[in-house]
Amino acid sequence: MKGIVLALLLALAGSERTHIEPVFSESKISVYNYEAVILNGFPESGLSRAGIKINCKVEISAYAQRSYFLKIQSPEIKEYNGVWPKDPFTRSSKLTQALAEQLTKPARFEYSNGRVGDIFVADDVSDTVANIYRGILNLLQVTIKKSQDVYDLQESSVGGICHTRYVIQEDKRGDQIRIIKSTDFNNCQDKVSKTIGLELAEFCHSCKQLNRVIQGAATYTYKLKGRDQGTVIMEVTARQVLQVTPFAERHGAATMESRQVLAWVGSKSGQLTPPQIQLKNRGNLHYQFASELHQMPIHLMKTKSPEAQAVEVLQHLVQDTQQHIREDAPAKFLQLVQLLRASNFENLQALWKQFAQRTQYRRCLLDALPMAGTVDCLKFIKQLIHNEELTTQEAAVLITFAMRSARPGQRNFQISADLVQDSKVQKYSTVHKAAILAYGTMVRRYCDQLSSCPEHALEPLHELAAEAANKGHYEDIALALKALGNAGQPESIKRIQKFLPGFSSSADQLPVRIQTDAVMALRNIAKEDPRKVQEILLQIFMDRDVRTEVRMMACLALFETRPGLATVTAIANVAARESKTNLQLASFTFSQMKALSKSSVPHLEPLAAACSVALKILNPSLDNLGYRYSKVMRVDTFKYNLMAGAAAKVFIMNSANTMFPVFILAKFREYTSLVENDDIEIGIRGEGIEEFLRKQNIQFANFPMRKKISQIVKSLLGFKGLPSQVPLISGYIKLFGQEIAFTELNKEVIQNTIQALNQPAERHTMIRNVLNKLLNGVVGQYARRWMTWEYRHIIPTTVGLPAELSLYQSAIVHAAVNSDVKVKPTPSGDFSAAQLLESQIQLNGEVKPSVLVHTVATMGINSPLFQAGIEFHGKVHAHLPAKFTAFLDMKDRNFKIETPPFQQENHLVEIRAQTFAFTRNIADLDSARKTLVVPRNNEQNILKKHFETTGRTSAEGASMMEDSSEMGPKKYSAEPGHHQYAPNINSYDACTKFSKAGVHLCIQCKTHNAASRRNTIFYQAVGEHDFKLTMKPAHTEGAIEKLQLEITAGPKAASKIMGLVEVEGTEGEPMDETAVTKRLKMILGIDESRKDTNETALYRSKQKKKNKIHNRRLDAEVVEARKQQSSLSSSSSSSSSSSSSSSSSSSSSSSSSPSSSSSSSYSKRSKRREHNPHHQRESSSSSSQEQNKKRNLQENRKHGQKGMSSSSSSSSSSSSSSSSSSSSSSSSSSSSEENRPHKNRQHDNKQAKMQSNQHQQKKNKFSESSSSSSSSSSSEMWNKKKHHRNFYDLNFRRTARTKGTEHRGSRLSSSSESSSSSSESAYRHKAKFLGDKEPPVLVVTFKAVRNDNTKQGYQMVVYQEYHSSKQQIQAYVMDISKTRWAACFDAVVVNPHEAQASLKWGQNCQDYKINMKAETGNFGNQPALRVTANWPKIPSKWKSTGKVVGEYVPGAMYMMGFQGEYKRNSQRQVKLVFALSSPRTCDVVIRIPRLTVYYRALRLPVPIPVGHHAKENVLQTPTWNIFAEAPKLIMDSIQGECKVAQDQITTFNGVDLASALPENCYNVLAQDCSPEMKFMVLMRNSKESPNHKDINVKLGEYDIDMYYSADAFKMKINNLEVSEEHLPYKSFNYPTVEIKKKGNGVSLSASEYGIDSLDYDGLTFKFRPTIWMKGKTCGICGHNDDESEKELQMPDGSVAKDQMRFIHSWILPAESCSEGCNLKHTLVKLEKAIATDGAKAKCYSVQPVLRCAKGCSPVKTVEVSTGFHCLPSDVSLDLPEGQIRLEKSEDFSEKVEAHTACSCETSPCAA
């Protein structure tokens, strides 16, 4: 019963809404008032906005069933451009009049159940007006469900079919229904929008979860009331908000707000008169895009005569770039592009005919044509190319940009396809290449609009690839693959697989570069079908038969597909397996995973997490490999407040067989919250570069030894040599992921180019033309213009007008050049380009280069009739004019340039950014307005304002409301109250005067932004910003005629020292070096006789002054301590006595009671006072201190380490009674400070404490007096505390010095006072004037030539000593006027672990000084580098600046992630410690006078590889020998060295082989395995002396034997004995072979053959190949390819199972019986019984084993592992004589005996 009642109630409730759908009267005209407002700007008041307002009456009457007429009456349009809400709307009469004719025409629409159907409008009504109708009818769209009050649905509207929520409220008393409807435009099933310019961009879907650039929503409120005829819509109010922000949303956003009101006025009798014309169906409510797609939002132009307008703009552009670029030139160029878009084919032909022969106009027109992108423009470009009216370069550039800018429609696509097939395009390879690549891009853009790419679109590219493959044209194959990569369509995968190894048998025969191009072609396809591409790439990556470079490229492409965790783990598993056989691939994979795992970009978070997990599978020691192995380096950043980031990546692919990288790829990628793009990518491939760099054309195949070596290798087991390499250099460039150009240069092209440059220019047309243009001078102007960016996103507003977000950027580069060249001697008829390097060249030139970049971003309404919105303009203008005369003499290594002085002010760089509110309408273009968004008002600075009472402020607010009364405060006021804000204004001006050059360099900065409204980055960017870098002439005493800069290097550098010669007379003439040295010493004030005396006196005076200050501070400290003790009488007597006893016993216990590090903590300072036993010492005289120093220094010099101990004890005793020691120690070097005994460091702590302020002293005395501890308890506390020492308090231990440096190290690590003095003294002795023994290497002179002949300027003289063990450089900068000012720089590498530098300046370089030291060592247990800088004296301005900057250092360090503690560190000193905690992280400690900060595990952008040892798979400690050994280490790592000593062999890759060689048989130690076979080195044990080795070297025409006989060295060359008396020996023929005596043996070098050095002394052997032989050797010494894990490669390329098996594989059979080698390789049968599948079997070795010859028995044997293949026992196997390999699979491995020495019954020769 209850159910029946409930059902009846529900039925009754539903019946109440049976007729609530809105209807219109069938007999009357319904009249409504309609008002629509669109405002663009910022939500805060007081800022400018721009918008439009439409007022009208709307009449609706019935036409037929479910069909109504709509007519607009009395339309009125108003514009708003001003400060909101103060300024009023202004009536736009002309625009109203222009639109009234169309707006007042009736329209018909279908309407049923509250839903709007199709709309019918007259054909002559524009789409803009039709969309305004849609905006009105959109208010009538309402869907009412009878049984629900709250419901969601996807509803049709102007913006598409989007998610909508309804809430219905009924007012039964008033018979009204209120409906609230909200629409989310971010959640649409079918959204109406249009995006232009991002066809090639990658949209970031995951970023929308973090931030949305555009967000939009609308809300509607309906008031419905029941009438006799039904429910009537009484009022509809709508409000739409579009929020736009390029940054994070929390930083604010610009808004576009649409408000609509449709209010019922009443009804009137009658019906609307049906129109006489037929109405056209314009579709449903959805917005229809019209001509606004071709209308730029930054211009509004009438284009009735585009040809004439284009001519006018062209003339304007050309005239504006005659001398310099005018500010409006980029905007004019965009106007030209807009006019070309409006031009038809005939207009374009007329323009070309008019300007084709006028160079500057022609260039400008050709710059704009491809940017237009219309069908007519592309068609016209095709005609120009077909008619051959363009040069090859013009045609290639035009095609490249035209196809990328053309709208991807059907007609444009068809024209592009026809253009590619045009015979004139195919005629020129450059044009054809550009056309094919651009066509691939067009296919990509065209097919992105379709569900699948049609076959006919890809057919030209597929046919090109197939035809090129059939003909074997590798360059065309590469071109087709690159174009298919640009297209990026999955339909091309099968075509590309034909060129991928593992998918096609023919692909394995293709060059590696073709295979890698095929892999790279899959990268863009992966964006469409990542799963399929991942499958293909993973197969290639896992295939061991594929070349390593191709596998690395597959790995690169795989990670670009952003695989999941499963795929990443599979990749890591493969890399882990390959780490034993292919270190290049393993290193590349590991470094790529490591780099990705550290990425901070949110787009890559899932991939970074997957890589982090997968790295656990790999061996971390792979990160320890050096840069000889393939690497991936990545640096990225992402700022969430900007919602933008960037990543720079470099992929370095090395090869085991080459010295140089075979491929380098660098790319820069940008990330935004909307898209991500590869802005630029550059790839360079090099193959066989070593062959080309050798610069020789030696026919090694013609040498007799080449044939001999070829015969020998045939006897090796299945020998496989290296494939030949054809020298080739290729490169490509990509923009936004699309390849736009590539080139290939083979050896022939490069050699022909070099030959052409060295031959007479008359033989080569191109060289002759270039030289003629250069020598005859260049006069002209060059200008290029680009529209570098066009991005547009258009969405409809609820009003029916298009809202657009756009970004445009245009750039103009201009250069006016006027040059004249003179060459001495005058070029003759046989003059070549290379002779310019031996001539004297004078260049007189005047250039005026300038660049102007204009960026415009807009947000607002953009229609063909009117525009309104916000516009951001950013301009960067650089203008660098120069007039000069340059002299170049390469023979004398002299360069000089002269330029006149600056006569007028010149703005070098100008940057301006402005934000406007703009309105324009087509009916009245002159009324266009631009208003600054942040008004320029005269508001006072907030600091100068006065407090005012409330009454006045309220009055002002009332007046503001009255001014905006027209807006209707109830309907449209944005805020309840309006406040006035002063704009945020900042300015900065600074000028620097360069008096010597007579110029001022000024910087002017000014910003006027909206940060006072909301202090975020977005509001800081809104407003006006100006930056100017200006150069102005400065007043000087005498007029400057010209400025000169001269650089001279080499032997004639000394003759240019102006202080030594009279410029007018003897400049440039050679001078005696002694005179040069003496004169320069006098100029610099270097007088050896007075130097030590002056410095000693200066030191003593400073020391006395320090002692006086120190004594006064110590007395004050003692008095203060007594006061504190008397004030704290409550302390226990035991505490007092124990404190005093601690003080009295401090001298005896100082060595066991070191002070702890200082701390800002109160309690830590108290404990530190307890542990410092030296704080109450009394001082002694400074004279005693000085005597101790001198005595200690003398002892150190005489006795070395012995003197060290004596000086330490002496100085310790001295320091216990002298306060000056602590003063001295504060200025000691950083290296001694942390390594000296604890008691000396305690002196430093006391010194730092006594220099603290008075308030700090009181705190410390309180802590001291209130503590009680004995010296023993102090030591005990220290022992407990030292186990918890802070990281930054660890000691830096310098690297142990070699024997030669121990003496200096002992001095530096002695006591503090001795260390200070001896260090300074040592540095004075080391800083010898290099001019005493070396001429200057470089002289740089800058001078101003004045009309009064007064010298003015500077000169720098550089000396360098790099031949000695201590490399040193000295530079002196002198004022060439009569002043004594100079600056002196001295840098020296003291030892392999330490370098020092000093900079002194002032009068004779004696006023100011800065010292620096860099040294390596250990910080804790980590290898570290410490840099110390101290400044004994610096200018006062520097001090004041340092104090100001120092206040911000703690905060800045905190913001950068550093942690720290306030500590009293050494004054006037900064220390930086970089400790390597892993190859990719380091710990940083920075100590400045008042602060210690540190950063743990700071990530390095690239790994710092430490030593990798072949025998240990662990991280090796780096030597950090960076100062002297780095070049040698690099060369050693590249070159490699093979060593043989007794039975120990060390290969090129550093693998030790502890195996004896078989007796009496030659083994191939090393040979050239390239097809050239230039050399072979053989070795065997000596017959006569088993401890010695015999060496045989075959190369060129020489067969060289080296051996020991009767304990004497013997050598034969081509069987002719050469005694030691005839050494050194050098061949007369080329290539050269040289043999010279070295120690007890000889050294052979033949660099042209690939032998850098071969050293032999009978017992040991060392062989070092040349660099270019990297990876080209084989033999027992290995391949020299750094692949240590597969070092045991046998001649057939397989890897041996053990070392002995490996050595035996390289043994050579005897060529004759006299050699005594009785071993040979033989297949053996396994003796023991083997059963397979339960049946007996006999097994044979797959590979031969070394056995004695027939008739000989083994004397020595070893066990070797070999593989066996088994056969059934009843199967016979015939092994022919001499067969050395069984072509069967290996069933198992077993150890068998191999013979290494044999005994024969009869001599083989006798047989």
Curated annotation (Swiss-Prot):
Ranges of residues in domain VWFD: 1536-1714
Vitellogenin domain span: 24-664
Record-level GO BP terms: cellular response to estrogen stimulus; response to estradiol
Keywords annotated in UniProt: Disulfide bond, Glycoprotein, Phosphoprotein, Signal, Storage protein
Additional notes on this entry: The serine-rich portion of vitellogenin encodes phosvitin (or two phosvettes). It is assumed to be phosphorylated to a level of about 80%.
Biased composition (Basic residues): 1101-1111
One Pfam family of this chain: Vitellogenin_N
Signal peptide span: 1-15
Biased composition (Basic and acidic residues): 1112-1123, 1187-1198, 1233-1247
Tissue specificity field: Produced by the liver, secreted into the blood and then sequestered by receptor mediated endocytosis into growing oocytes, where it is generally cleaved, giving rise to the respective yolk components.
Protein name: Vitellogenin-A2
Biased composition (Low complexity): 1126-1163, 1205-1232, 1263-1276, 1309-1320
Glycosylation sites: 1094
Induction (UniProt): By steroids (estrogen).
GO molecular function, one term: lipid transporter activity
Record-annotated disulphide pairs: 1538-1677, 1561-1713
Region called Disordered, residue ranges: 953-974, 1095-1320
Coiled coil: none
Keyword Phosphoprotein: yes
Function recorded in the entry: Precursor of the major egg-yolk proteins that are sources of nutrients during early development of oviparous organisms.
Keyword Ribosomal protein listed: no
Family annotation (PANTHER family): VITELLOGENIN 1-RELATED (PTHR23345:SF15), VITELLOGENIN-RELATED (PTHR23345)
